[in-house]
Amino acid sequence: LATSNSVPKASNINAQVRTDGIVSVDVLDHVAYSDGTTVKLKNNLQYDKETFKGLAFVSGDTVRYQASSETGNFPITYTVEDNLGNVASANITITVHKSDAASKAAPTPHDAEAQVAAGQKVRIPITLTGIDTDGDDDQLLGLGNKAPTLGRISEVGSDYLVYEAYPDSSGTDTFSYAVEDWTGQRTKAQIRVGVFQGSSDSGVYARDDEITLRPNTAATVPVAQNDISGDNTNLTVDKHVEVQGLDGVSVKDNMISFTTPGSATTDYIAYTVKDKAGLSDTATLTVNVDPNAAIEPPTAYDYRVPSAATIDKKSVDVDVSQWIANPSGTANELKVGVHPSASAHAHVKGGEHSTTITVDRTARARAVPYTVTNTKYNITSTEFIQVPAYGVFPPTLRPKAPELKVNSRETIEININDYVRVGAGKEPYIERADSVSATKASNSDVDVNDETRKYTAAKDYAGPASITFTAVDGKQGSDKTKIINSAVITLQITVIGRDVPPPTFSSSTIDVEAGADPKTVALTAPTNA
């Protein structure tokens, strides 16, 4: 919040969370500061170590808190500083209430929007933080009670959905997604995807980076993290870089490594990122060398273990290497650990430089705080690994299931046991006939019983299609205490047309400098056949 005042003003904040829950407070939303200045949350939270219960730490511009099993009010003092050196402090009072499944309010997920060209995919991020007054531990289940009609969901991640638009679609596709809290309450929100005909932009956009380091500092910079691929594919950093003022610059694993000179200066590295087609863009990494440069804490991010990765496992191994970085040095200076509060159920697997953490699963979902320490300067950052509960998981897609292909106008019969995985000793069923919907089918009346269904492809279509239904892992019968788990499942189908449609192309812009070396582009990569 920018004002005309010369000194930042921090406000007191109140937050609440259940016992053993997590809450995140965006501090800068409660700070007023002058126009033209920037404000940063300092990494020095203050609280009474004798009476304080729980775990509190700074993560970027937020204060995060994990409650213990004790209720009460726990104040924390936070401090912000602007770029002129002015500081201000205020209190966050966190009220921890007892976990109570009977009275807990349901989560309130947010609606989401996206747009995509026909025939293309788009990743839709789903916000799971701040949607529940009881804490930030809700789980994304996937689709809700309404499936898309202009495309299909091709992937369900721990905090995102991937939507694939059909090649002949246009308009607005409206469907729902579902989340579940720790008590089992499920709520839904809406997703709107604008699908347009015409070429999508498959270009590559490299963004400039800037870093400030002390003299004689070895550093590794993941320059591609903020670069963009128009078709959402991974980018690679070209081995050839142009360097001004630095020696020993190298590229490995899409990161640029170098050592700063021994005195204050500003140097530059021009680098190129490419997609799988060979489309590329160039950006500049500016390296400021300052003897008084601040030592930044390691960067780290949360990781939510997908339910599908935990099936029949009493423990899970999580490699956090792709979620951590060292903005003030090299990755070799980082050490991964587990916060003492979680040591009874988690530990680092392997040697001293291991980045893999083993988490034991328990009867309830667990958030394990892991630490990343810059061993050269002894600065530590903390984030969470969220692990589903042991023994109970909803039906999920069976890995490596056979592909579903059908000729247009023809019919295939699908046994859901071949495509849906459930717990040991259980069988998958379709919950209700009215939960089944199909796209690119000859009619909307899908022939179905609770174990098999038929799909008849439309006569004048070729391309991706789908069938969606609610799967359960048992039948209630007369045992009303039996726990039945359910999930909305989408099976991807490929319809083979009688006539092969012409391929479509994603538009691309290729910049070639006069007199420079030629560029090679693989035309098959931006082509959809």
Predicted regions and their residues:
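Solvent-exposed loop segments of extracellular immunoglobulin-like
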Residues: T37-N43, D136-G142, D231-D238, G329-G337, ...
